[in-house]
Amino acid sequence: IAEQNMFGMAAGLALSGLTPFVSTMAAFTTMRAAEQVRTDICYQNLDVKIIATHGGVSFGQAGTTHHCTEDIAIQRSLANMTLIVPADGWETANAVRAAVRWPGPVYIRLGRGFEPTHYESDDYGFEIGKAVTISEGTDITIIACGIAVYHAAEAAKLLRDQDGVSVRVLDVHTIKP
């Protein structure tokens, strides 16, 4: 396990003009290699794209050493870091394509890969920094990101069908900027 070295090498590749994509578990990206991500990549605003898997408690039975509930807060605090939390595989594909074109470091937080699919394709107007309106409503608004988007949409359907509540659901996939 050498996540620190991986991020140091990614910084070197970015300094040579390449756009490296690196991937490891969120706990190791955010905790084990925090200094390298912050100092080597973010401070220099390098074009490194980080794919962090197993965010939150998605690793289930692996326990607290592999859970990472603080990664969004930590990555959001880093200078120059763009932070995206896709809802599903379709949105992940859009996030990766957008990250390629986006200058500077990007952190894309994923679950374990068993998340339910919300979107039916990748053709819905994904744009870094702009929320996606899942449903329009006038009574309440639910704001969600990541796996919570699916659950927010399901809750909105229940509220509409059972109680007649008009619910707007927003997929705020970009946490920063």
Regions found by a protein language model. Give the residues of each.
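Short beta->alpha junction loops
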Residues: I1, L170-P177
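Conserved thiamine diphosphate
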Residues: A2-N5, G12-T141, Y150, V167
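Short, well-ordered alpha-helices that flank and scaffold nucleotide-derived cofactor binding pockets
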Residues: A11, T39, K157, D161
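Short helix-loop-beta junction
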Residues: H151-L170
